[in-house]
Amino acid sequence: MNPNQKIITIGSVSLTIATACSLMQIAILATTVTLHFKQHECDSPASNQVMPCEPIIIERNITEIVYLNNTTIEKEICPEVVEYRNWSKPQCQITGFAPFSKDNSIRLSAGGDIWVTREPYVSCDPGKCYQFALGQGTTLDNKHSNGTIHDRIPHRTLLMNELGVPFHLGTKQVCVAWSSSSCHDGKAWLHVCVTGDDRNATASFIYDGRLVDSIGSWSQNILRTQESECVCINGTCTVVMTDGSASGRADTRILFIKEGKIVHISPLSGSAQHIEECSCYPRYPDVRCICRDNWKGSNRPVIDINMEDYSIDSSYVCSGLVGDTPRNDDSSSNSNCRDPNNERGNPGVKGWAFDNGDDVWMGRTISKDSRSGYETFKVIGGWSTPNSKSQVNRQVIVDNNNWSGYSGIFSVEGKSCINRCFYVELIRGRPQETRVWWTSNSIVVFCGTSGTYGTGSWPDGANINFMPI
């Protein structure tokens, strides 16, 4: 091969290699650009259309590393869409209730820094349950705990921890409140927090950690709310609030809130005469609440809330085994489903019940006169038949030698049904135990079960003689 042929051959090979390298670089550049722009797109499974990621709440930020010829490209995988809760599954069929949680706050206060609280409740987001309570701005072993029997002071705040975690010094103070309610709409928490002067209180509506709306007292007489969870269906949450006399006519209103903004207010209608401290649960597509009549009835009022047209109806639980305290002996107590029974209506205590076909599950103190002991049972026909008194599946939660207090319901969505759970406030200190100057509580929590269960008693358990004065 002569020199000219060698030059031509070498040149041809070099040109071929250069062309191949150029094509590879173009391919790498095209891949890089494509992946960069697809980083901000998701495939919608319903319509196979490309949707932007930006409006979607990010639960996880996953990064996938792709290696191409020593070139590293980072690609963000779009997360699943977070949806509002609708609670459309049926209610679980249960045989009774099984123990779920107990925080032992008072026992732990004997040797640790635990908040003084009252008015506890439980509520769950789609993945986890939390316990709430209204703190008194002090721990128990602290001179500020003197006088914490009082309900409304400016230092009270709403506390929030994972269920089962006592309210220690690291507990988050969600808002300023001496009355509250909380619920999760599937995307974020809503907290309704009431504080201020008795004659001119303010309710703040905090959504996703931001104050979105507020409303002032409308009757200038202790604006107050549920002291248990509110309920959200398809992005709209509802909460029951009362302003007015605690032992006479008051003004109850049902508020509808969308992402923290009040979108509608409905007045109470129906036959209920007095409403306080409702325990509400989803009954798709609506919401149902069992409340406290602090004026005329020891039978509990019922509020039915239509989430579509904002209409309200109210009545009373039909069961002749009534749920409030104080109350008449079971042999002489009554309820006609529509009206207060005018039997020891004042004062009362927060409680709960829920319908199960024609029957009703309910909880109440064992004592008919004071907040001691706690029991649950089902009343056959208790939701549909006036003065029904056939009791089955009774369980003792706290024996009658120990103090109880408020109780309320919360709902948990399972794979196939919605379970009903309840908590019991276990009050210690004043007014019943005058050796100490404080008033506080722990809680015990039970949930519905379709299985079998045993017996027991789950009181607070603290020896008052071991406690700080």
UniProtKB/Swiss-Prot annotation:
Keywords: Calcium, Disulfide bond, Glycoprotein, Glycosidase, Host cell membrane, Host membrane, Hydrolase, Membrane, Metal-binding, Signal-anchor, Transmembrane, Transmembrane helix, Virion. One of its GO terms (molecular function) is exo-alpha-sialidase activity. Glycans are attached at N61, N69, N70, N86, N146, N200, N234, N402. CDD domains: Influenza_NA. Residues 1-6 are intravirion. Its cofactor is Ca(2+). Residues 91-469 are annotated as: Head of neuraminidase. Belongs to the glycosyl hydrolase 34 family. This is Neuraminidase. The lineage of its organism: Viruses, Riboviria, Orthornavirae, Negarnaviricota, Polyploviricotina.
